[in-house]
Amino acid sequence: MSERVVVVNAGKMNYDHALDFSILSNDVQVYEDSTNAELIERIQGARVVVTKELPVSAELLSQFPDTVELIVEAGTGYNNIDLDAAKKKGITVCNIPAYSTERVAHTVIMMILNFASTMQQQIGMLVKGDRSNFTKYLQVSHTEVNGKTLGVVGAGHIGMEVIKVAKALGMNILVHTRTPKADGDGIRYVS
């Protein structure tokens, strides 16, 4: 049985060129990007296919060779892969559930702070040369987030990181999750 691994769109994973794929064994073939036709050609005889945000439809999966046993999505989301079609073909799909948890949570908090401070409106004023918002009286409203209530849907890795940062900002937390815990530590579970 082939142990070959094919990374079909490494460019999506290595956008900052920090990864050194050259240290991988000869059993791992790495391609910067692949069209669907190239992908099918390149994975012939492969056991594992590694992708990053590449659409893998039922139609594309129907062309996969029988040697493929595993598709690895090199990120958290795997909605780009037709899971039912993969299952029918006997291909396991896995992802990296804790990948960039902090970055995603920080982006959520950044958006909250952006809206609370009407940052986009203020930037727009500055771009036009309007500095009236920075005089004695603010022309654009600003809302403090401390004491405000944040609703979080899902208390997985990302949700819990959002909660941690929001609590540090003094926010009250309501959480809806499939696996609620007892209220406490500044968190109230709701349904």
Report residues per predicted region.
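Rossmann-fold NAD(P)-binding glycine/threonine-rich loop
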Residues: 79-89
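Rossmann-like dinucleotide/phosphate-binding beta-alpha-beta segment
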Residues: 23, 138-191
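N-terminal glycine-/charge-rich "phosphate-binding" loop or analogous flexible N-terminal tail
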Residues: 1-48
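Phosphate-coordination loops involved in phosphoryl transfer and adenosine-cofactor binding
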Residues: 2, 68, 146-149
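Phosphate-binding beta-alpha-beta segment of Rossmann-like dinucleotide-binding domains, i.e.
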Residues: 97-149, 175
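Short beta->alpha connector loops at strand-helix junctions that form conserved
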Residues: 32, 74-75, 91-102, 177
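Short, conserved loop/helix-junction motifs that constitute active-site signature segments
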Residues: 22, 62-67
